[in-house]
Amino acid sequence: MDISIKKHEHILKNEIFFIKTKWPHFDILFKGIKKIAKLSKNNKKVVILERTNLYGGISLFAPFFNLKNFISIDCITEKLKKRGAYNKKFLSSNKLIKIRSEHQYHYKKIKLKKSSADFIIIPNLLHHIDDPSILFKQVKRILKPNGFIFIFEPLVRELHQIPEDYSRFTPFGLTSTLKKFGFKNVSFEYSGGPFTCILYYWDQALQFIPKNLRKK
């Protein structure tokens, strides 16, 4: 891997997703992203559905791919537009590679051709979709026969990006839903357990304590 990409990944893991201290399950996301990046080198088309507006239109994962065969779509909504780029503050490091999303579409109207993508990545997005069935129909339409989708979703998470926080899928619920829409060979990986949940919610509780009192 290129040194600049390694630095980019390091910043994402440690200063945006905090995988060592807060969200360790995001390591699964990075493994999946890098695996698809390797598989897609031979002119395979990759589409990623994101909420890049939060970061000023910057795609966090575009640098991992060959941009000639990569499309980042900002799944924008009117509510998200009003909130603005409130996470852009995390992108101040000059070690980050900043590549903007090429397109902004509502998830119900993704303007890509039928059977045009070999891989579709949906990272940390599904719980912000009010009608997942429409999204899955869009994905099914865009994906080539024998194409591959990679979905990363949290099961345990506080309410966030309110009011656009709609649901949580278990691995089994998501598997069942995907099969209903005709997706085959569905598999999943998950991490964590009860102690991970306890630590996560303890971290959330600490946010309500003034910073000068937390160490005490």
Regions found by a protein language model. Give the residues of each.
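Surface-exposed loop/turn positions
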Residues: K44, K114-S116, N146-G147
